[in-house]
Amino acid sequence: RPVELVVVDNKSDKVEAANAVKRLTEHEKVLAIIGTYGSSLAMAGGEVAERAKVPVIGTSCTNPLVTQGKKYYFRACFIDPYQGAAAATYAYKNLGYKKAAVLTDVANDYAVGLSNFFKKSYKKIGGELVADMKYSSGDQDFTAQLTELISKKPDIVFMPAYFAEGAIIMKQARELGATFVLMGADAMDNPDTVKIAGKAAEGFMQTAFPYDMTMKDMNDQAKAFTEAWKKNFPNKDPNVNATLGYTCYDMIIDALKRAGKADREAVTKALAETKGLATPVGIMTLNANHDAEIPVGILKYENGKRIYLGEIVPE
């Protein structure tokens, strides 16, 4: 029996996200949903899915609250406490940076959460936090914050921004003569980051999901995904949500096979029991909170290209 894929656009809006899930559960009568990328969108749609008792797997919704107390919501990604701790560990232990600062979008739950987890972990392992700067979504001029950061002389600045905003920050930082290393998180993982930032992206680092086309040791599932992507989109590199969407599909098909029937409750139960599943982002096991236990990847930008450095396990 073939699998039918029904696509609905949530328009990156919380109200539309809830409406999209309602349409899929009530009108399309879907068995399961491959969920959204943003945590706020996932939480808005998740409430609808919970009431409808339809299993959902989010792609890159990393806020811990997404799955907290939810029976029907799962995710194919790690969560922000783990990612923030990994960034702090890499900055302090692997790079040897003893002084850090953060630059946070206070209007974004994702950014606020990640910054808090980074700060807590960085100080816990011995690092010194020299500045804690803020801005709001939509800001275009970061001169004041960057000037203050330059005066504090951090070794590294952690900024969990979305890629378009983060690229602007990179450009303005270099124009002001900043020499500190800039480090972002998974929301910066987009091929357009370099296109927007240009030469200012040189030396930028970020945490990422454990897949990239530059990986030296790609597993069989990652190879299969990459080959399929290149065949269908020869002029475009895959982004992280494409990889995780593919992973979510694998997880649903695996759960459906183990459930033995196309039943929402049976598939939900099988998803909760996901363990040791080979996927493009590694061996997938879901914990009791329905969160994926996968490593955190590290990317660096050199000579206009992304380089996958490997994985990090936080302290």
Predicted regions and their residues:
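Periplasmic-binding protein-like
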Residues: 24-37, 57-59, 101-104, 153-163, ...
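Loop/turn elements at helix/coil->beta-strand transitions in domains of secreted/extracellular proteins
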Residues: 1-4, 27-32, 51-55, 69-72, ...
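Beta-alpha junction/loop-to-helix N-cap segments that form part of ligand/metal-binding clefts
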Residues: 1-68, 76, 135-142, 164-167
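Hydrophobic alpha-helical segments within soluble ligand-binding/sensing domains
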Residues: 17, 76-99, 112, 141-143, ...
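Extracellular/periplasmic bilobed ligand-binding domains
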Residues: 48-49, 114-209
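Extracellular/periplasmic periplasmic-binding protein-like sensory domains
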Residues: 170-246, 257, 300-314
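Segments of small-molecule ligand-sensing domains
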Residues: 229-243, 251-305
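An alpha-beta-alpha
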Residues: 73-137, 156, 234, 252
